């Protein structure tokens, strides 16, 4: 009864008004699974290919009708009749059908839409919530959220090069408390921006995008907002950065417009260390360019024992590239973005590889999102203990937070909120 009888994709819009792929998978039992694919703004060079039409007369070339056609034709023909519980087998069929390293023929947006919709259909058919279907019956942790309250870089139109300034409510006793803490700080920050004459418009991920003079000024604003909301920075709340360094790395230097200077990789590592020494920063994502492995090694040697160093553009959720990073001893955490690799099975393989080598994993959204909340279930299913899914505004971000509230409610006494223990690779 769990055999796939129909697969149908359509073109929908994401949170930036750009087209993306949504897929419905129908089973013999009458159950349907639906999933929609996210899209990134700052993307790693080695990410799986997001297939766009290139027809400038539609959506400025960003249409996804080709990817939709691939789902409705080649992929559907290959998968109809197969048991939806055979997730790995289904994903492998799509990988082989595509035949490239980067999903360049079918498009990762096509394969991922099907992969996630199959999992949702199979979970529904099994009578299980998605997080239980994927994660099994063992104990589960709710993730500590990284909440993006100040946006810069590719996510905002201001002079800040560092892309995301985030708060992490590590002192909370539950996810519900953590969410309240983040929301209260977010609203305190809005009042603070208002009082200083900064605009309170928000960026792609829901954070504020004030035109500040330096990155330190952004961090100081976060300290003030945390205290104004009644919490202690460094105790109740820790900070996290996503530098997205590849976006300002050029000709062997890191160019910070807000600071008015350029840095070698050694100098930039020292700059980041100075921020860590001055502010309660526990996590830095993409602190070096994705191809600057020497810089990554320097940064890991300098900060890897006390700060979580997350590889996003560096690893692109690819088990092969992650294995290389582990061997070279760079970074100590993996950012997990399902559309960087293009199937659920490969995503889970990357998380498992990270875990076995004492690298933390951070489940992540993209800047172009939909109401799909699959990553909330994935964060719990994998027990990765951290999630990055934007600020405390925009419905596309709230969909994930609200789903985590529901999951915590369902788990009841069995729900664990790890707090600082989420940084187990640091011995926290």
UniProtKB/Swiss-Prot annotation:
Q: Which domain of life is it from?
A: Bacteria
- The UniProt annotation places Mg(2+) binding at 242, 285, 312
> What does the cofactor section's free text say about binding?
Binds a second Mg(2+) ion via substrate during catalysis.
The primary location reported for this protein is: cytoplasm
Molecular function (GO) terms listed? magnesium ion binding; phosphopyruvate hydratase activity
Q: Which UniProt keywords apply?
A: Cytoplasm, Glycolysis, Lyase, Magnesium, Metal-binding, Secreted
Q: Which Enzyme Commission number(s) are on file for it?
A: 4.2.1.11
Compartments in which it is found? Cytoplasm; Secreted; Cell surface
Q: Which leading EC class covers this enzyme? A: lyase
Recorded GO cellular component terms are: cell surface; extracellular region; phosphopyruvate hydratase complex
Catalysed reaction equations from the record: (2R)-2-phosphoglycerate = phosphoenolpyruvate + H2O
The catalytic residues are: 205 (proton donor), 337 (proton acceptor)
User: What cofactors are annotated for this protein?
Assistant: Mg(2+)
Which residues are listed for (2R)-2-phosphoglycerate binding in this entry? 163, 337, 366-367, 388
Question: Could you tell me which pathway this protein works in?
Answer: Carbohydrate degradation; glycolysis; pyruvate from D-glyceraldehyde 3-phosphate: step 4/5
| InterPro entries xrefs | Enolase, Enolase-like_C_sf, Enolase-like_N, Enolase_C, Enolase_CS, Enolase_N
Gene3D superfamilies given for it?
Answer: Enolase-like C-terminal domain, Enolase-like, N-terminal domain
Per the UniProt entry, what is one GO biological process?
glycolytic process
NCBIfam families found in the cross-reference section = eno (TIGR01060)
Return the similarity comment: Belongs to the enolase family.
Cited function: Catalyzes the reversible conversion of 2-phosphoglycerate (2-PG) into phosphoenolpyruvate (PEP). It is essential for the degradation of carbohydrates via glycolysis.
Name it: Enolase
> What lineage does the source organism belong to?
Bacteria, Pseudomonadati, Pseudomonadota, Betaproteobacteria, Neisseriales
Q: Which gene encodes it?
A: eno
